[in-house]
C-alpha cells in the first residue's frame, strides 16, 4: 500500500513472483486494501478470468470485467480488463488512481498499447511477473538511460550498455541482449519492490522439484537468426530438424516414456513443438496422441484439455499455445522439442510441470539445447550487485552464469 500512497515517489515498481507464489491472491489482496479505483490489466482472457475469480472468492463484489472477450464493459471500483479493450476508451479510466499490470514483462516500453495507455493516463503502475526480462536486438538498444516517469517526462542518467566482445561471425546486427525490465531503455518500470525466490518456494514445498534430461541432437550453431535477431529463422530451423531427424527422435522418446523397459510409465506428457509437422508426425506414430494448435477451435481445445487432465489422453502435443494459462498440477512430464532464445519461454514451459502434487516425480525432457543454454529453472536467481543493477543468473555447466544484461549470441 505504501507504494501507491507515496505521492513523492513517481517511480513505477514490480513484484517478482515465480509460478506458485499465488499471484492472483496477491493481486486481490492489494486491490482490496487500496480502497480506491484500481485498474487491473492482464494480457489474456484466461489470466483475467483467474484474477477476477480469485478476487470474487473473498466475498468482494465491488469489481467488474471490462473485456470484449467476455462481452462485458462495466467499470467498477476495481476493474479487471484486457489492454486491447480499453484502448478506444482511455478517457473513461482517467479517474483511476492505481494501475496493476499482471505479466508485466510483456509491456513494450517503446511502443504498443501499454506504453500508449500509460503515457496518456500518467498514473503510478505496479507490475507483477515471474519473468522480469525482455529480449532485444543489440543494434536497437540506445546508449542512454532514459526512464519513463508517471508524469510523462523522460529522465536521462547513466550509460548502461555492457562492453560488446563479439564472437566469430557475430556483430551488433545479429547479437541480442536479454535485459531486466527495470534496465531497458526507455523503460516503464524502475524498481524491484519485492521478490520471492524460486529456491524459497521449492524449500517450502510450494513448487515441485524436477528432474532434467538433456536428449538434444540438434545443433543450434547451424541455425540462422530471423530478421529481428531475437529468435531462430524458421526455414533454417526446419532444415536443421530434418537433418538430425527430430521428428523420429521425438516419437521414439515419447514411446519410451509411455512404455519404459524399467520403471513406471509417465502419467501425462505435454509436448512443445516448433512446427505442426512434428506434432502431426507424433500423432501418426504414437497411439493416443492429441494435438492442439492456434487453429484448434475453442470448444475442441477445451474438450482435449479436459480429456488430457482426466487421463483419457496420455500425450498432448501443442504448437505454442499452452505456454501460459494452463494449470494441471498432476502433469509429470514436459517434452521440449524445440530450441528457444527466450528465457521467459523456457521458464513458462518448465513451469507447466513445476506445480506440486502428492507423489509426483516431475521430468523435463529437452531436445532443443535449452538446458545447455539456460540451465535448470530452480537455479534461477535474482541478483543486485550494485543498487538498481538487477539481473538473473543461472547454473550452466556447473557454473553460475549471468543470463540477463549480457549479450546473447
Where do the PLM segments sit?
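Conserved Walker A/P-loop ATP-binding site and its immediately adjacent core
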Residues: 19, 25-57, 276
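Conserved pre-motif I regulatory segment
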Residues: 1-16
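SF2 helicase catalytic motif II
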Residues: 91-134
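Conserved helicase ATPase core of P-loop NTP-dependent helicases/translocases
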Residues: 49, 64-73, 280-281, 288-320
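Conserved segment of the helicase C-terminal RecA-like domain
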Residues: 352-382
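Conserved interdomain linker/interface between the two RecA-like ATPase lobes of SF2 helicase motors
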Residues: 162, 167-171, 190-270
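A short beta-strand element within the Helicase C-terminal
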Residues: 96-97, 314-318, 324-340, 345-352, ...
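Inter-Walker segment of RecA-like/P-loop motor cores
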Residues: 57-90
